[in-house]
Amino acid sequence: MSRLVYFSSVSENTHRFVAKLGLAADRIPLRPTEPFLRAEDEYVLIVPTYGGGNGLGAVPKQVIKFLNDPGNRSLVRGVIAAGNTNFGEAFCIAGDIIAAKCDVPYLYRFELLGTDQDVLRVREGLGRFWLQRSQIPA
C-alpha cells in the first residue's frame, strides 16, 4: 500500500494527474466487480468532485464505500480534490466534504487534469506533509 490513494472515473483525469506526480499510488476500484481496496498504512486521498455544482453527489459512490470501511477511514490523513471551476461555489467540494467528515486537513485543490505547477506543489507539499507527520510524537 502506498501513501496515496485515489479514485478516477472513466475520464481518467485524476489518474493522469496522479501519474504525473510520479509517486506510488493505489486506485480505488471503479467497478463493483473489482476487488475492494484495503488501506494498510496512512495515506492521503486524491478525489474528483462529481455533480453539476449543487454539491449533491459530489463525492463518488466508490469513495464513500471505501471510506465507510472503518480500517480505511482510520488511516486517511489528508485529502486533495480535483474539480471544475464551472461548478462555481461547489468547485472541489468533495474535498471539503471528506475533510469535514473524516476530520483531516484539506491539503490542496486543482482543476481537471491539474497544471505542471499543481503537480509540483502537490509533490513538494506531500513531502513536507509526511515529514511533519513523522515528527509528531506518538
From Swiss-Prot:
InterPro entries: Flavoprotein-like_sf, RNR_Ib_NrdI_bac, RNR_NrdI. It comes from Beutenbergia cavernae (strain ATCC BAA-8 / DSM 12333 / CCUG 43141 / JCM 11478 / NBRC 16432 / NCIMB 13614 / HKI 0122). The gene is nrdI. One of its GO terms (molecular function) is FMN binding. SUPFAM superfamilies: Flavoproteins. Gene3D superfamilies: 3.40.50.360. One of its GO terms (biological process) is protein modification process. Probably involved in ribonucleotide reductase function. Belongs to the NrdI family. HAMAP family: NrdI. This is Protein NrdI. Transmembrane segments: none annotated.
